[in-house]
Amino acid sequence: MEQVNELKEKGNKALSAGNIDDALQCYSEAIKLDPQNHVLYSNRSAAYAKKGDYQKAYEDGCKTVDLKPDWGKGYSRKAAALEFLNRFEEAKRTYEEGLKHEANNLQLKEGLQNMEARLAERKFMNPFNLPNLYQKLENDPRTRTLLSDPTYRELIEQLQNKPSDLGTKLQDPRVMTTLSVLLGVDLGSMDEEEEAATPPPPPPPKKEAKPEPMEEDLPENKKQALKEKELGNDAYKKKDFDKALKHYDKAKELDPTNMTYITNQAAVHFEKGDYNKCRELCEKAIEVGRENREDYRQIAKAYARIGNSYFKEERYKDAIHFYNKSLAEHRTPDVLKKCQQAEKILKEQERLAYINPDLALEEKNKGNECFQKGDYPQAMKHYTEAIKRNPRDAKLYSNRAACYTKLLEFQLALKDCEECIQLEPTFIKGYTRKAAALEAMKDYTKAMDVYQKALDLDSSCKEAADGYQRCMMAQYNRHDSPEDVKRRAMADPEVQQIMSDPAMRLILEQMQKDPQALSEHLKNPVIAQKIQKLMDVGLIAIR
């Protein structure tokens, strides 16, 4: 359990640092050692979600709930993955199921509220999510003055994020006025018309509904600025960047409160490859946007463009910093994907930059000294550092495998031996150490197979020959109790998988009742292989 906790903590630190693949590896190794630990599946679900692999996040969320049905966090993980997969109805049901077990769980309550809001948005269009929302409000004199009030902007953002709150906000006259502007109808007169039930009001003449404010309602400077912007856009599309810059600059002079004209200038410099100027203009645009309470989506775009400029220069650490700033303002799939791409490249760069065979040799020698003294934990640390410094050296994995075997961490020893053999298939030590780990686990059949592979490479290898003889004698003389056999067998992940297969359990029951059925089942090579595995580990015997 100490090894499991250590791997879990390493995974948590890696996830916090943004090293998602490292976190996944740690959690997966811990799960192999403790497959019934619900917390490990929950943590791995979070890591998969952060990576963008929502299907695997969902599968781990389901496993968490199966292992610990009364734990609210499991339902949160499962529901969050369903949300990312756009399976909103299922996510809602999952939150509801979780609340049956933990009625006061705040995370589940908020998740359910958000899910209900998103489902409501699907059924009814949310006018507060219009792409040109602030432009419409600024164009209409009824709402233009309201935009200078910070509480009004907070109200708008609240209704954008939680449209289900609209029903509770209708008492606010500002909300009714805003709806009138956004929907293009005069909601203020509706109550009066409903009260005059008889006689009913005559049907309104066609096209008498209040028209949406047109460009004519804008001040002259803003109208001219928009025209300059359109001219700039046309020039930009034709890649006439100098002309585009002149028009955007003129638009900015006419309407200095609109950050869009500055970000358009930044886009031109981005295309020209002048990334310093692009970043300078984006920073200026953000400053103008903050001062004039611009929509957070526009702020996010400016930060994303700064991130893109650093990405182009292969300055991935800076790019990640600004992508995260953009995501904090407004989360979009494109920016998230770009950020993850930059993180992956940066991680690989750091890994490659860390490689140094000379330092790896120093760490290996330190590890050898500690191993000779019997200080196996310290030796393992030195070998691990050596592997980071030179991950293509097969002997380092072999040395660390020897440490793991001394520390009775046989599964980890086997993993290192596999890596060693893969890197250098003719290296005898990789095979003998793998066989030694299997022998220590009392898996004599597998151990003999591996010792034989070593002898195939070098028939004079005394270590392999002696090991083969030991395993043969141990297999012949073994008198394990049924409990020992079962406990040892069930520690093997392959056996666990076979025994958890409902079809195999049915076949084994049938073999007990009708031994003649065995010959039929052995005709299927897949089933025959599984039965042979169970025989090898001593779980079943055929007489």
UniProtKB/Swiss-Prot annotation:
Modified positions (N6-acetyllysine) in chain numbering: 8, 301, 312, 325, 344, 446
Record-level GO BP terms: cellular response to interleukin-7
Gene Ontology molecular function terms on file: Hsp70 protein binding; Hsp90 protein binding; protein-folding chaperone binding
Subcellular location: Cytoplasm; Nucleus; Dynein axonemal particle
Residues found modified as Phosphoserine: 16, 481
Biased segments, Basic and acidic residues type: 205-233
TPR repeats: 4-37, 39-71, 73-105, 225-258, 260-292, 300-333, 360-393, 395-427, 428-461
Region spans: Disordered: 191-233
Residues joined by cross-link Glycyl lysine isopeptide (Lys-Gly) (interchain with G-Cter in SUMO2): 123, 210
Quaternary assembly: Probably forms a complex composed of chaperones HSP90 and HSP70, co-chaperones STIP1/HOP, CDC37, PPP5C, PTGES3/p23, TSC1 and client protein TSC2. Forms a complex with HSPA8/HSC70, HSPCA/HSP-86 and HSPCB/HSP-84. Interacts with PACRG. Interacts with EEF1AKMT3. Interacts with HSP90/HSP90AA1; the interaction dissociates the PPP5C:HSP90AA1 interaction. Interacts with FLCN, FNIP1 and FNIP2. Interacts with HSPA8/HSC70. Interacts with HSP90AB1; upon SMYD2-dependent HSP90AB1 methylation.
Comment on protein domains: The TPR 1 repeat interacts with the C-terminal of HSC70. The TPR 4, 5 and 6 repeats (also called TPR2A domain) and TPR 7, 8 and 9 repeats (also called TPR2B domain) interact with HSP90.
Name of protein: Stress-induced-phosphoprotein 1
Phylogenetic classification of the source organism: Eukaryota, Metazoa, Chordata, Craniata, Vertebrata
